[in-house]
Amino acid sequence: MSFALGQRWISDTESDLGLGTVVALDARTVTLMFAASEENRVYARSDAPVTRVIFNVGDVVDSQQGWSLQVEQVVEDQGVYTYLGTRVDTEESGVALREIFLSNQIRFNKPQDKLFAGQIDRMDNFVLRYRALANQYQQHKSPMRGLCGMRAGLIPHQLYIAHEVGRRHAPRVLLADEVGLGKTIEAGMIIHQQVLTGRAERILIVVPETLQHQWLVEMMRRFNLHFSIFDEERCVEAFSEADNPFETQQYVLCSLDFLRKSRQRFEQALEAEWDLLVVDEAHHLEWHPEKPSREYQVIEALAEQTPGVLLLTATPEQLGRESHFARLRLLDADRFYDYEAFVKEEEQYAPVADAVTALFSGEKLSDEAKNKITELLSEQDVEPLFKALESHASEDEIALARQELIDNLMDRHGTGRVLFRNTRAAIKGFPVRNVHLLPLEIPSQYTTSMRVAGMLGGKLTPEARAMKMLYPEEIFQEFEGDESSWWQFDSRVNWLLEKVKAKRSEKILVIASRASTALQLEQALREREGIRATVFHEGMSIIERDKAAAYFAQEEGGAQVLICSEIGSEGRNFQFANQLVMFDLPFNPDLLEQRIGRLDRIGQKRDIDVYVPYLTETSQAILARWFQEGLNAFAETCPTGRAVYDAFAERLIPILAAGGGEELEVIIEESAKLNKTLKSQLEVGRDRLLEMHSNGGEKAQQIAEQIAKTDGDTNLVTFALSLFDAIGLHQEDRGENALVVTPAEHMMVPSYPGLPYEGATITFDRDTALSREDMHFISWEHPMVQGGIDLLMSEGVGTCAVSLLKNKALPVGTILLELVYVVDAQAPKRSGISRFLPVSPIRILMDARGNDLSSQVEFESFNRQLSPVNRHLASKLVSSVQHDVHRLITASEAAVEPRVSAIREQAQRDMQQSLNSELERLLALKAVNPNIRDEEIEVLEQQIKELTGYIAQAQYQLDSLRLIVVAHN
């Protein structure tokens, strides 16, 4: 290397130092000053890791004074260059710029500049960059984007609802599935899609206080969405950052109570401009035409201000008609303006539903049904379909006509677009519940303490006394102190120990009402029989609960028993277990359903055993009988439970408080009657049309199958592991489909997106991720993959490389130039551009004559024939063919332009076809179905107009290139 004072060089190892100047030389060392970063470096002259910076004719260079020069001639004098040319700003020609006055901030961002400046990257990084671009393009184009990456089983009806709603602009819908069908997951999938496509950036979730943590965990664990819980304390803290605390976070979760109690916080939440509002347990919002409740008014005000609204609620029949109307009013007050009109309109749908039921069961349509259908759909639409149904056509044709008729009716169906409701009856795949009621003898210690408590508890209300009598172990401890070991003699504990020992190979979930009971049961199992158990209660932090859940889920060396308190178990599901023990009983049928729902969920593969050990001659025995004989609540889901409970509570509570009573048999008999009546009313009121629409039928199956195909994508595994390698993460195989990924010392960036500081255990397998909550489920949508790709792009990894092609059929020294261009439309994410024109890579492979060989030579197979070159040799090779590389880059533009035009045209076609057909459908429906909002149509028209402009203006640029030189050995 020959150095001279005033020459400009850049560092190969620290490219962020900027442009350096040689300021001192002696026999063995050279000193460079990097003015941009105010650093000096002293290198050995013989092998300094620096590259000489020389610009060529045609380049534009910046001076230290801030003006730029278009280079027309390069003059050398004793190893130092002067550039002659025209100033870009004043257009003055013949200007000279000595290299010592070049701007210190010059960065080599263009791939060709980096190549000539010797900042040559590793070959495998170039390959990784190209694969990242290609994979990202595929992901953005996929119609399933936003549905593949969540940690949830592939359950057709959930995927259908999420796919249907998640793609809408500002969806306003009511999710009213029965319990155990996964409304929270549906809402999460919709949020996830809206976030990924840029349709929603600010989201507010309002839930009952007890469910805050459940939502926080579900959003984080299943969808990698990090919400912040806002309460008074958090708002006071956030006040220092902004006047409105709600503006300090994009994703906020808070309780309805919090907004109801504080007018100031409610008003701040209103002003914070959300894109999407999600309300769980919306059936608790009370409404009467004259007097809506405060809670209802809070949500109503938020729903008026927010474009997208998801309400999660119990089934409409459980709510009653008026209450159901009140929910719909929140979604669209213009459409659902009057309760009487709504009832009339609903009644009109009854015959339609009958007609559809007839169609579904393949019966012939009666004339009355035909007339009814013709009233709803125009005659020219339905006549040919009726003919097809009655002709002797093939089964397929008849099925097609039937489906088309049903689809048309669905679209016109009053609330089909705003209401989704699945029932267990309409969805297959639920386990059978085997109920084991086990009457056990009451220990004498309990009899005594309960008798004394009965004498002393004179001041208690019947309800408080009834509650107390349900938990004899607590009464005993009141007298004997907390340390007393009731579990030494309680017959339920003895039974539990025997059951656990008999079922050594099974995981067993035990639920008790109180945290203290759960903790003491764990102690009993451990001390009396050395059984591995873990506890789960409301006093534990989320991380502690996660650890307990993971310990329970572990196949080998995990806990056999998990003991939960009532509140602690909310929202946690353990489908991998099928043994449930209720150590005591809750007061409320809904809580009972919630307990069984921990295991009895869609996705449970086996039948469930429900064990109810209860003490005879206690309130537990009465409650067990009432649940079993009055409601059949153990064996079946009980949507009517609450209504029956409300009807009999006044008569039932005194009996529970007294531990028995004459009237019990009558109450059980009457409860069973009322339950039967209510259930048959529900059955009659079942809206078949709505159910068919909600579970998505064939279409739902196809979506699930399509996503299942992408699971286990080996391409993802290879790509993700290379990506982690390139960025410098440490990987360790843990078996059982698991890897541990931790930050290493020499990482490209100080912290890696989506990876906790202490590292994470990851899996690419959906089933493993479902049974192990402590693992991250890695998919193309996971922040660790998305963030890693963004890092590659922004840090300029792999933008230029040099490789050798060992091929004796070609002369030594033959060169090829592989160029990757990207087509990019500069448009806001929320415009939806990525569906039609995401960043699109175009690969060009130029031979020395300037021919494009990319169509004959595929990337992966070509790459396998190449081998890497060390940086020093690579720099020499580049210097020797610099002129040819310039020529080929210029020639490649002619090859890339027609492909860019083709990409633009294809994107326009896709966009017009997709959005115009959606627009035509909405306009046609608007004529017959008042549920189509004007705003939806306006937004679509506007979107088509904007996207047409964005796509037309899409530009291309050179993203990366690789020089390939032929060698023979």
UniProtKB/Swiss-Prot annotation:
An MF annotation (GO) of this entry: ATP binding
Record flagged with keyword Disulfide bond: no
EC supergroup of this enzyme: hydrolase
Keyword tags: Activator, ATP-binding, DNA-binding, Helicase, Hydrolase, Nucleotide-binding, Transcription, Transcription regulation
Annotated motif DEAH box, positions: 280-283
Complex and partners: Interacts with the RNAP. Has a higher affinity for the core RNAP than for the holoenzyme. Its ATPase activity is stimulated by binding to RNAP.
Entry-linked NCBIfam families: PRK04914.1
Official protein name in the record: RNA polymerase-associated protein RapA
Gene: rapA
